[in-house]
Regions:
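Flexible glycine-rich surface loops and low-complexity tracts that mediate binding to linear polymers
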Residues: 109-111
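Hydrophobic residues positioned within well-ordered beta-strands of beta-sheet architectures
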Residues: 34-36, 57-59, 126-130
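A short coil-to-beta-strand element that immediately follows conserved catalytic motifs
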Residues: 26-36
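Short, small-residue-biased leader/transition segments that mark boundaries at the very start
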Residues: 2-4
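Acidic, low-complexity intrinsically disordered segments
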Residues: 10-25
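Catalytic core of non-heme Fe(II) oxygenases with the double-stranded beta-helix
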Residues: 38-107, 117, 134-140
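A generic structural micro-feature
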Residues: 30, 51-55, 120-124
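Ligand-binding loop in jelly-roll beta-barrel domains
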Residues: 113-127
Length: 140
């Protein structure tokens, strides 16, 4: 992980997307965007499952993509509370891999468990990540 020296062009991009997200759910939000950091993954590198529970939301910008690139995944820590027959009937899985590509931004609750699968390409995988805290919020 590397800190970004000048995030002045990145933060407005995330801010605009977070505002669009808030509009979609019918909320007016004032948020604090924390300084982003760069994640790089060389071949065979990965990220263990973790969360950002000390923040309301986290965001990831995907800087590049390729064949056999490491994949972001989310884990459902509540799956074990569903009876096995419900898990089978509704084909519930405890891991979900969102489809993302270069330039995509994904924003998710900070408490969600997530990780990155092993990188299998010689090209370095790059993402920018940051945390978001909600200062004020109201329903529209």
């Amino acid at each position: 992980q590397m800190c970004i020296r000048d995030s002045s062009n990145i933060l407005p991009l995330i801010s605009d997307n977070f505002k669009a997200f808030a509009d979609e759910v019918g909320a007016k939000v004032k948020a604090k965007l924390w300084e982003p950091w760069l994640n790089t993954y060389k071949k065979a590198q990965y990220q263990d499952v973790h969360d950002h529970a000390e923040h309301y939301f986290a965001a990831i910008i995907f800087m590049n993509e390729g064949v056999d690139f490491a994949k972001l995944y989310f884990m459902d820590r509540q799956k074990s509370f569903s009876p096995p027959f419900i898990q089978n009937v509704f084909q519930m899985d405890d891991v979900w891999y969102p489809r993302v590509g270069k330039g995509d931004i994904i924003i998710f609750p900070g408490h969600m468990l997530h990780g990155v699968s092993p990188h299998k390409n010689d090209e370095i995988r790059k993402t920018l990540s940051l945390n978001i805290d909600v200062i004020e919020a109201q329903l529209l």
